[in-house]
């Protein structure tokens, strides 16, 4: 068998069926990688640094010799690691009793490094020699990043799910997905709910690059399978910044030009929902979050909110915060183009997911 170098589109098609091995260093992988790829580093972070220094300060041949020293002692363990991985994947597929062709049924392996150079070529040679059928990505991870960024420039049929803070928009999105609708949960991809309090109860945020990769993969799934229910993708209304991350500029501009179905829920109902959702968190992280917005909230309101928090009067604390976020959200709505055309308000009596979805879908069908 011979190693085949393939272009990004074919690589992604095969990646839906077969494992992808990222042979870059652990640090490179940790920073960002192709979603779903497995880390099989040819060099450790320190070894990569040594090889790179030799290449720059001595010669290409010297760097290759140092790399071969590192590679030689790892050959057997790398082959065995890939063998074990394939066994685990096949076992998992059998347990899931999948009837689709979405599990590896042979020895096909996809390999990539940063630019599709010597690291992927070396590992691909080894795995091919052992008996695996190996494909490498032309241009490597760098080419994948170019492809990922191109996804954000593509037109997508977005419908924005709007509503003031505390409207339960994420719950609506999740229920829409369970019923077969196409959705993108940006806050889920970002591990952040979007406000100063958005990190509470969430895992650490991915890097900006990894966030973009995750979003690109989600979009690519829609282009591969075709969106359902009229080719519509529901996505929650967001500011461009979600915690420490930014929605890619071209995609965010598409969001701002898309129509909005706005869940208009009474203030007190939303306040009750927020009190229940955030009242479980400790005083210290809540106070830290309040302090982060004190300049915009104002000194008096900040002091009052913290006092209510210390007195365990969460409802009055959140009342102050919710008024602030309502004003903040209204400014964002006002900045949209052709507001009367883009925004359709849907009157809802409470934060109740299923009944609000019924109203949402009715408006979606009847709206021009």
Regions found by a protein language model. Name each.
Residues 1-35, 63, 149-153, 158-162:
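Flexible, polar/low-complexity N-terminal or interdomain linker segments that lie immediately upstream
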Residues 253-260, 264-368:
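Conserved NTP phosphate-binding and transfer environment spanning the P-loop NTPase/kinase superfamily
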Residues 20-24, 37-40, 184-185, 234:
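Short hydrophobic beta-strand that contains or immediately precedes a catalytic carboxylate
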Residues 69-97, 104-137:
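Catalytic cysteine-centered active loop of the rhodanese-like fold, especially the PTP/DSP P-loop
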């Amino acid at each position: 068998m011979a190693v085949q170098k393939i272009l990004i589109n074919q690589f992604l098609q095969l990646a839906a069926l077969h494992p992808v091995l990222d042979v870059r260093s652990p640090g490179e992988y940790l920073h960002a990688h192709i979603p779903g790829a497995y880390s099989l580093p040819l060099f450790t972070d320190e070894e990569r640094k040594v090889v790179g220094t030799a290449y720059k300060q001595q010669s290409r041949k010297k760097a290759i010799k140092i790399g071969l020293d590192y590679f030689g002692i790892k050959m057997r363990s790398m082959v065995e690691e890939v063998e074990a991985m394939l066994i685990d994947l096949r076992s998992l597929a059998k347990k899931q009793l999948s009837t689709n062709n979405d599990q590896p049924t042979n020895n096909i392996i996809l390999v990539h490094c940063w630019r599709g150079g010597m690291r992927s070529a070396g590992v691909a040679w080894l795995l091919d020699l052992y008996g695996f059928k190996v494909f490498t990505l032309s241009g490597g991870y760098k080419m994948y990043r170019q492809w990922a960024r191109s996804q954000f420039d593509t037109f997508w049929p977005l419908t924005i799910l709007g509503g003031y803070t505390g409207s339960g928009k994420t719950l609506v999105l999740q229920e829409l997905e369970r019923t077969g609708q196409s959705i993108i949960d940006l806050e889920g991809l970002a591990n952040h709910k979007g406000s100063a309090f958005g990190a509470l109860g969430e895992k650490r945020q991915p890097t900006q690059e990894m966030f973009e990769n995750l979003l690109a993969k989600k979009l690519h799934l829609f282009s591969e399978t075709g969106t359902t229910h009229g080719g519509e993708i529901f996505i929650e209304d967001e500011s461009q910044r979600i915690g420490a991350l930014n929605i890619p500029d071209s995609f965010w501009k598409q969001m701002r030009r898309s129509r909005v179905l706005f869940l208009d829920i009474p203030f007190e109902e939303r306040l009750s929902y927020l009190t229940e959702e955030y009242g479980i968190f400790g005083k210290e992280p809540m106070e830290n979050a309040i302090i982060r917005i004190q300049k915009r909230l104002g000194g008096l309101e900040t002091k009052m909110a913290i006092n209510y928090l210390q007195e365990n009067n969460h409802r009055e604390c959140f009342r102050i915060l919710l008024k602030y976020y309502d004003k903040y959200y209204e400014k964002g709505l006002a900045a949209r183009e052709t507001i009367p055309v883009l925004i359709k308000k849907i009157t809802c009596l409470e934060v109740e997911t299923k009944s609000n979805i019924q109203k949402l879908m009715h408006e979606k069908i009847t709206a021009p």
